[in-house]
Amino acid sequence: MPVITLPDGSQRQFAHPVSPLDVARDIGPGLAKACIAGRVNGKLVDAVDVIEHDAQIAIITAKDEAGLEIIRHSCAHLLGHAIKQLWPQTKMAIGPVIDKGFYYDLDLDHTLTQDDLDLLEKRMHELAEKDYDVIKEKVSWQQARDAFVARGEDYKVAILDENIRRDDRPGLYHHEEYVDMCRGPHVPNMRFCHHFTLQKTSGAYWRGDSKNKMLLRIYGTAWGDKKQLNTYLQHLEEAAKRDHRKIGKQLDLYHMQEEAPGMVFWHNDGWTLFRELETFVRMKLKAYQYQEVKGPFMMDRVLWEKTGHWDNYAEHMFTTSSENREYCIKPMNCPGHVQIFNQGLKSYRDLPLRMAEFGSCHRNEPSGSLHGLMRVRGFTQDDAHIFCTEDQVRDEVNNCIKMVYDMYGTFGFEKILVKLSTRPEKRIGSNDVWGRAEQDLAAALTENGIAFEYQPGEGAFYGPKIEFTLLDCLDRAWQCGTVQLDFSLPGRLNASYVGENNERVVPVMIHRAILGSMERFIGILTEEYAGFYPTWLVPTQVVVMNITDNQSEYVAKLTEKLSAAGIRVKADLRNEKIGFKIREHTLRRVPYMLVCGDKEVEACKVAVRTRRGKDLGSIDVNEIITKLQHEIRSRNLHQLEE
């Protein structure tokens, strides 16, 4: 007679084994209808799985994130069901859940057109609307293998042979005549899978290995109700408008080309933006008392062997050779910073030592993963490393956290998710050292009033870390900042300082990044602002334009005056209609357009228009300069028009 404890602490006793669906029915018909699965003693199970002993149970519905993931996983199986009806010779590979959706890799002897994709989605909807039950069956390894051999599912057979133990009992899920293999859980009935759409296709190598066959990958998204689906699709539409690649081309910021895959060609305006961002970071480095250094962009392979990077990261490193020596182009800055620390004797009185670099790094990312500024091979890290004593860790982490929020706040990011990753099973350092380090990180977050989530076992082998993830205006997550403790690298590279008792002590090293990659952060900002960068950051802050040739001299002198005041300004003296000029510079997202006619020349004023289409009227030249200088220096996100 199992006793079931519910999330609110209440208990229900049953005279026989029950399933989560039985428990939901006992609570009420509404919950039974909404029940997708159960969480039994912390583990997700199917709605029909039998519980024979006392247990803690939560009923999973479409309102839960876990419920949405189950719906998406079942939609992947639904895709398999539909495609096998339309193209029976298809061989199914894997169909996992991904962020906000799912995909299925399959071997299809047919080039899928957009019409085919539409047909496939239509068949999926027809099947889902039948609201058939999904039947779960646990079988022996041999039974599962025999079933998939009989169906000609070579990839499922390979998964069984290579990834599943012979004494295991795989789960088979029956969608009418279609059978798929999965750990589950899945929806009990297809009425939960009505709100989905297929999105795109791509190629994907079997098991991610380019030596294997290229499979077809079909992507889709699925949600708990129509409103959620429509909201997501609207976000996708808005995201497409904000795509940094599209805006980057419109604003002539940068370009990429095949001869340098994953490397950025910065144009004048893009490089102006980059340097302004760099200036801002440099100002913050000074405020938080960092040294700025510059290390070489490549070093002998021997050094990377000492750090452990060669053993664990070699496939991501570019190499070159000269005079019988092999060099690695650096994928990160930390080994170089330890070399700088090692120059000259250091005392505990010299610590903490905060060392920052705009490091030019390169990583050999797969060509298929490259994506504009968001995923590149050559990038600049706003990287820093803090060398300190164990007693200083907490204060230094506190300082890093303050700097993170200070900088993110300038850009208007207010929703920040924070995760603390703790000790993994395989690690270096004693439990005492790890315990204190984890406590220091948690205490620093708590002292700053920051809510965070633990990620047990997700820390690196050399230390725990804090991750900062930004949520943008479309609620997309961008993991940018990290504060990572390192108990390993300083010792590997013989770093030490002289302690209070005149002994050699290995310093604790804190890896700290805030923006992460400068290139990627510019991509994030471009999409966050849709190209409407704040005035302090935008490449051209003001355009001064004449109505007729009579104002040309006035425009030229005013442009010089604005430039001397530290404002990035251009003059537009073209013989074009003023409406044409305004439209053109509005499309270029120039914050302020100063129009000069005869009246403005006579009164020593300018007519001010904004890129948002607001007319601020006629303003005295010195007054507008003062206001612009204040907006730029304060790095205010809100413009004069607002």
From Swiss-Prot:
InterPro entries: aa-tRNA-synt_IIb, aa-tRNA-synth_II, aa-tRNA-synth_II/BPL/LPL, Anticodon-bd, Anticodon-bd_dom_sf, Beta-grasp_dom_sf, TGS, TGS-like. Its main location: cytoplasm. This is Threonine--tRNA ligase. The gene is thrS. Homodimer. Zn(2+) binds at residues 334, 385, 511. SUPFAM superfamilies: Class II aaRS ABD-related (SSF52954), Class II aaRS and biotin synthetases (SSF55681), TGS-like (SSF81271), ThrRS/AlaRS common domain (SSF55186). Gene3D superfamilies: 3.10.20.30, 3.30.54.20, Anticodon-binding domain, Bira Bifunctional Protein, Domain 2, Threonyl-trna Synthetase, Chain A, domain 2. The lineage of its organism: Bacteria, Pseudomonadati, Pseudomonadota, Gammaproteobacteria, Enterobacterales. It is found in: Cytoplasm. GO terms for biological process: threonyl-tRNA aminoacylation. Its cofactor is Zn(2+).
